[in-house]
Amino acid sequence: QERARGITIFSKQAILTLPAQPDAEETALTLLDTPGHVDFSAEAERALQVLDYAVLVISGTDGVQAHTETLWKLLARYRVPTFIFVNKMDLPGADAAVRLRELRGRFGDGCVEFTTAPDPEARALCSEPLMEEVLADGQPKHDTQLMAIARRQVFPCFYGAALRLDGLDGLLH
């Protein structure tokens, strides 16, 4: 029944290779797709313990659910740096500004929108090194942002529609 509804019931993995960029070498990623449904929480929690980074997928129409908050707490417990992808933004009722307010209200001001033009002020409020760079140069340095993400001070938020491959480029780069 879960499979018929498209619910992941076991963790699955895929190996992805991102091509080299002018400023980065080719990158190999191991993607673990874990169950998002509350009935399979134990399976998801086992996978969280081995992650270097996580992408927490949230519905653009439904927003943060109770189980999403449980996953968020587990990601914090295991200190997993987390990116947020708000999916289904192509559907009626999906509103990026509403979702960002909700994310900040539930998960903190470290949730910063990364899809459109950068907001240096929002990023600066997440860590002292980011603040210093924004005050000095108007923009935080890339490496400083990466460090803030790794330390779970910044949680980059991306918006798109995964089935249409919309919004994924920014997330992957």
Regions found by a protein language model. Give the residues of each.
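Conserved P-loop/Walker A NTP-binding site and adjacent catalytic elements of P-loop NTPases
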Residues: 1-62, 66, 71
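P-loop NTPase catalytic nucleotide-binding module
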Residues: 60-173
